[in-house]
Amino acid sequence: MAALAAGVSKQRAVAEGLGSNQNAVKYLGQDFETLRKQCLNSGVLFKDPEFPACPSALGYKDLGPGSPDTQGIVWKRPTELCPNPQFIVGGATRTDIRQGGLGDCWLLAAIASLTLNEKLLYRVLPRDQSFQKDYAGIFHFQFWQYGEWVEVVIDDRLPTKNGQLLFLHSEEGNEFWSALLEKAYAKLNGSYEALVGGSTIEGFEDFTGGISEFYDLKKPPENLYYIIQKALRKGSLLGCSIDVSTAAEAEATTRQKLVKGHAYSVTGVEEVNFHGRPEKLIRLRNPWGEVEWSGAWSDNAPEWNYIDPRRKEELDKKAEDGEFWMSFSDFLKQYSRLEICNLSPDSLSSEEIHKWNLVLFNGRWTRGSTAGGCLNYPGTYWTNPQFKIHLDEVDEDQEEGTSEPCCTVLLGLMQKNRRRQKRIGQGMLSIGYAVYQIPKELESHTDAHLGRDFFLGRQPSTCSSTYMNLREVSSRVRLPPGQYLVVPSTFEPFKDGDFCLRVFSEKKAKALEIGDTVSGHPHEPHPRDMDEEDEHVRSLFEEFVGKDSEISANQLKRVLNEVLSKRTDMKFDGFNINTCREMISLLDSDGTGSLGPMEFKTLWLKIRTYLEIFQEMDHNHVGTIEAHEMRTALKKAGFTLNNQVQQTIAMRYACSKLGVDFNGFVACMIRLETLFKLFRLLDKDQNGIVQLSLAEWLCCVLV
């Protein structure tokens, strides 16, 4: 209950702007300015109670309490390590990033790339902090997390051994921004050890809020040059590297002066006329050193003598120190991989940049309601969350060689918080997605999930290449204009997890979650609908309480269970007293806490309707229906509910084996009827909003 209320409160705050870089979420409720002011007023340096300087902050296994690797560690503030500590010395540069005894080189590479873009760097590293002015032992950083910016506050106590920083540190002995940044990121993820192993892309995204693509340059798409050209035009961050197969190859230099294992930045592409034919060139930068490419189109290569001198001068002006040109064909031969981090619109301020349009959805896979697994599981696949994208504007500049107008879309599916959950043994799930074109006759269908029949025999228009246990799977797709259904899923069904689905499009795309409608129109029976069996039930009622008397919850339980226990077409252990109280709550119009004869008749007819639905859904006649089938059962009973409500129902009414028995099924239906009835009575303006005082609210939920 508390988690649900917190979720609703969070959604409302986000709608009002919480989570932007200018209004970041306060991680764990800690506010930097408030805490710093308290410390300055009291004259005491900040000690972070949420991430204390103790073994639990280091890790849980290899760096856990009692591990030999953690013996002799002392937490010290920079003021205890050197006489004149500085936050930043001469600007943040790649030389400030030196790896320590933690396997987080993926994070360090991302930080190094971030130093090349000052605007993006200072979104992560607020400037309002130092070891001189208003120093109170407290620092703060901002990271993008699953659709929102989060401000993380830390104290400046850092793990040391023999007077030296244990983990990330700067070449400058008195500079500490990089070590403090690593600590803040460790806090966000639960511990330093949680940072071991990862992808540079993960760091890129958490520092920028962008969406990343990866290309294997041994198998490049035909239009890769065009993709790079457009990415640069949109202000994206591009990095490339040469794979190393052994540790000995790291830092090795190729015959033509390229360094293996280093991350190079891609900074430009141009086309020149060379010997009467077009030659594609690409400009790179090595932020790690002075070594530069010595092959064709390098600084003093002879190829430059065979192009227009004015064009040569123009390209010379575009290349800064540390940058060099090479042919695109050589680029594909020499490098192994290319990573593109496409920035979200709020990361880009220049009006000249062609920005992406972004739509973001947060969702959840819940066992028994929305965790349907992949297409290998057709019985549950359709229960996964479903999202509709409407693409009606084609790209302005279509690719060469394409005849049909298309819409370019970047899809990214990211699972949430798995790194933080490593300490409890929850690793990455295998995730992926499929995209289906919606036929014309279903384009207006938005109020409920597309069912099992829609997916049977239907092939996706495109899908993620494979299910992978990565934090994010993403791909660039080109689709004809139309409406599309995106289905994100885990590989196996019944796997709980939170996710974030992002859609970056060249042109503005309309998008919505399918089945976000909530409505309830349950069948209202009439006592004249009673048949022979119903007359028997009525006579039993009169036998228990008399013709004109009212029946209590305990008596109701005895009557209903006696009738239903005689049925041979179902397995049923009986209604419990709480379900019977729910029944009385729904139909007790005069507030006596009991049911009269007419109210009892109405109740029995409702139960009979629910029994018909239950037996239809109990395919194996075992006395339970599978929790994921509740969506269909609820629809048959007149309820259309969104994923959030479906997930709540699964948590409330399904047993550990994800089955719902008849008692739970009826309790759910009766409860829903009661809640819809209450809301309609209170929604006087019929605008879908009810305002209640605290006392009124308590009376309603306690009914």
UniProtKB/Swiss-Prot annotation:
Domain Calpain catalytic: 45-344
Major localization listed first in the record, in broad terms: cytoplasm
SMART domains xref list: calpain_III, CysPc, EFh
InterPro entries: C2_III, Calpain_cysteine_protease, Calpain_domain_III, Calpain_III, Calpain_III_sf, EF-hand-dom_pair, EF_hand_dom, Papain-like_cys_pep_sf
Binding site for Ca(2+) 2: D618, N620, T624, E629
Region listing for Domain III, in residue ranges: 355-512
Location of region: Domain IV: 532-703
UniProt KW Cytoplasm keyword: yes
Subcellular location: Cytoplasm; Golgi apparatus
Active-site residue numbers: C105, H262, N286
GO CC annotations on file: cytoplasm; Golgi apparatus
GO BP terms: calcium-dependent self proteolysis; proteolysis
Residues the entry annotates as binding Ca(2+) 1: D588, D590, T592, S594, E599
EC number: 3.4.22.53
Function: Calcium-regulated non-lysosomal thiol-protease. Involved in membrane trafficking in the gastric surface mucus cells (pit cells) and may involve the membrane trafficking of mucus cells via interactions with coat protein. Proteolytically cleaves the beta-subunit of coatomer complex.
Assembly notes: Monomer and homooligomer. Interacts with COPS1/GPS1, COPB1, EYA2, NME2, NME4 and TOMM70.
Membership in a protein family: Belongs to the peptidase C2 family.
Protein name, UniProt field: Calpain-8
Source species of the chain: Rattus norvegicus
Gene name for this UniProt entry: Capn8
